[in-house]
């Protein structure tokens, strides 16, 4: 389907549910002539046994509008690019309204900026996050809805994950790129519940140029970073040491903590480190 520069094209997708009343998340890959990397479109939704009132279908309320989740995932993006997602908002009240947005994070854009929503109806907004080289990994972006000219008492939170972009790297740059090497799973000595456990990973750069660690990120608030590095020279190693608080961990349960390093290694832009805690 050809379309000229500056023009827009529309892709219509119909999901035929055969899995029953469950949430669904499907991916459609769109390929463009002259581009190796496809555009991945995510189609998400929920299937219910029967129709529910909007107030229940969209249970997170900001005044008279409702969303399905309190934190909206925009998606993944590489530096120099943007990520977008379409979000459905519901006017669950019995009165029409106008919806606009204010106090948005600098990298966040919501379109349309102003729209009218009839009573008991839904509308769609396109949320776009623009990358920023000062922001890596998972970041929060916020915007406050304004309903009929009145600012909501709380903001809507969006998340996006940003990693390095290697699409503009030359063959020579890729040949001389840093290469990380590490053991990605650690099982520290078993501890009693409530005791602290420590884990240390050693990351080696076996490439030809410095390995940059843009960000060290945890999936748990039970982790404390004791030692890290922001750059590892070729041939060098660096230690990443963590302390784990185990007061909420359970015996015979999955007590795995995940650490993610965001790097400039084309083969491992994200390094996942797993700490598996055993409670006695």
Each language-model region and where it sits:
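C-terminal soluble interaction/assembly domains
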Residues: 197-206, 211-280
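Short, solvent-exposed loop/turn segments enriched in Ser/Thr/Gly
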Residues: 18-27, 79-86, 132-143, 193-201, ...
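Short, hydrophobic beta-strand segments
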Residues: 11-19, 125-132, 240-248
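Short acidic/proline- and small/hydrophobic-mixed sequence motifs that coincide with surface turns
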Residues: 23, 38, 94-99, 137, ...
């Amino acid at each position: 389907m050809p379309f000229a520069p500056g023009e827009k094209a529309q892709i219509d997708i119909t999901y035929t549910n055969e899995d029953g009343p469950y949430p669904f998340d499907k991916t459609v890959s769109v390929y463009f002539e002259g581009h190796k990397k496809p555009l991945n479109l995510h189609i998400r939704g929920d299937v219910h046994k029967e129709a529910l009132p909007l107030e229940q279908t969209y249970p997170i309320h900001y005044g008279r509008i409702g969303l399905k989740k309190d934190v909206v995932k925009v998606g993944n993006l590489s530096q120099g690019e943007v990520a977008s997602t379409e979000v459905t908002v519901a006017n669950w009240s019995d009165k029409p309204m106008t919806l606009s947005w204010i106090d948005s994070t600098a990298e966040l854009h919501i379109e349309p900026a102003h729209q009218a929503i009839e009573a008991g109806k839904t509308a769609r907004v396109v949320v776009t996050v623009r990358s920023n080289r000062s922001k890596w990994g998972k970041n929060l972006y916020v915007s406050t809805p304004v309903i009929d000219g009145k600012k909501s008492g709380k903001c809507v939170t969006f998340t996006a994950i940003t990693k390095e972009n290697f699409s503009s790297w030359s063959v020579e740059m890729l040949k001389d790129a840093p290469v990380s090497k590490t053991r990605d799973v650690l099982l520290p000595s078993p501890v009693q519940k409530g005791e602290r456990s420590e884990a240390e990973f050693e990351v080696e750069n076996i490439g030809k140029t410095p390995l940059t660690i843009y960000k060290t990120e945890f999936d748990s608030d039970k982790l404390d970073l004791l030692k890290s590095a922001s750059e590892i020279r070729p041939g060098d190693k660096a230690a990443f040491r963590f302390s784990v608080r185990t007061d909420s961990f359970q015996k015979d349960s999955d007590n795995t903590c995940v650490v993610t390093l965001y790097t400039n290694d084309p083969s491992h832009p994200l390094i996942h480190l797993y700490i598996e805690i055993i409670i006695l």
